[in-house]
């Protein structure tokens, strides 16, 4: 019998045809893998700024419709950006604050957050940079402007689940405390966003800051404003409870509430009381923004029906309704809805340990007098916003 030929030669009549096909397939596969490996090695050696790359902003040729169509959808893009941010953070030294990941004060141990003073890390050189837009920092298109202890932190954390929302975790306090630093400084606080994503921030004190409406309007008259409001009586008690946890030696709630207890005069100079005068604080905002550019979210419904309120918010922001009932579960211990999966994490997360903190017991007569005091302000607020929040029922 004649000896067999070398590998890849024509099969002998006795050799099955399938074995020959399989052998050729293996050769082609090995060649393909070798070529891909060589291409990958060469790409990794190329410096990030070696030349214009189509479709990558800041690297030459701007992205066109063809490149945009090839980019991943919103959610995968957001996860990839967060992954690159965490990797870059691991390599950064302690003094490199520009690459530090923001830590939201509200969501305990929630990885992948985004907030003040941070930036998404630059794309690593190589093939990923050809497919991913690294994004850019933008001034916020939407701001949660109030109110303190109304549920602003919960709303922001819920919104950050949406793949098209990028938000600062910490409160920037730009329009009330740091306006002198300029818009460039403010923009640098923002996270990077991709095409189709919106930038957000929340600072509840803006709502009661006299200069804030004009300053935000000067930045952009198209800014969308969200106000989370809550029964002013329970809001005041919650405000006091937070202060009490930091300063246990402060006077009682009752003594701070009244300017003259025997006459029943409420002390409106106390910030816990003054913030609840929503109608008064809303007036300057309506001089700079149309009512249709503002959304008033019920803090009570954010607890009882978070998906319903988030549906309104998503519609207001022009976002696809992605956040639904399936994203929430009710924590019986805290008496508050929690996220089944927080941003950048596959694990359930509730807001921080202060959420659901027990309030001190307030005398019924004090509560009655406070409700009587707030009633005319509440009714005016209902008329101004076109929504009855039911605080006087």
Curated annotation (Swiss-Prot):
It is found in: Golgi apparatus membrane. Glycans are attached at residues 260, 331. Residues 1-24 are cytoplasmic. GO terms for cellular component: Golgi membrane. Keywords: Disulfide bond, Glycoprotein, Golgi apparatus, Membrane, Signal-anchor, Transferase, Transmembrane, Transmembrane helix. Residues 44-393 are lumenal. GO terms for biological process: branching involved in ureteric bud morphogenesis; glycosaminoglycan biosynthetic process; heparan sulfate proteoglycan biosynthetic process. It catalyses: alpha-D-glucosaminyl-[heparan sulfate](n) + 3'-phosphoadenylyl sulfate = 3-sulfo-alpha-D-glucosaminyl-[heparan sulfate](n) + adenosine 3',5'-bisphosphate + H(+). Residues 85-121 are annotated as: Disordered. It is a single-pass type II membrane protein. It holds the Pfam family Sulfotransfer_1. It comes from the Eukaryota. Coiled coil: none annotated. 3'-phosphoadenylyl sulfate binds at residues 149-153, 230, 238, 355-359. Its EC number is 2.8.2.23. The keyword Membrane applies. Substrate binds at residues 171-177, 202-205, 270-271. Disulfide bonds join 338-350. Belongs to the sulfotransferase 1 family. Sulfotransferase that utilizes 3'-phospho-5'-adenylyl sulfate (PAPS) to catalyze the transfer of a sulfo group to an N-unsubstituted glucosamine linked to a 2-O-sulfo iduronic acid unit on heparan sulfate. Catalyzes the O-sulfation of glucosamine in IdoUA2S-GlcNS and also in IdoUA2S-GlcNH2. Unlike HS3ST1/3-OST-1, does not convert non-anticoagulant heparan sulfate to anticoagulant heparan sulfate. This is Heparan sulfate glucosamine 3-O-sulfotransferase 3A1.
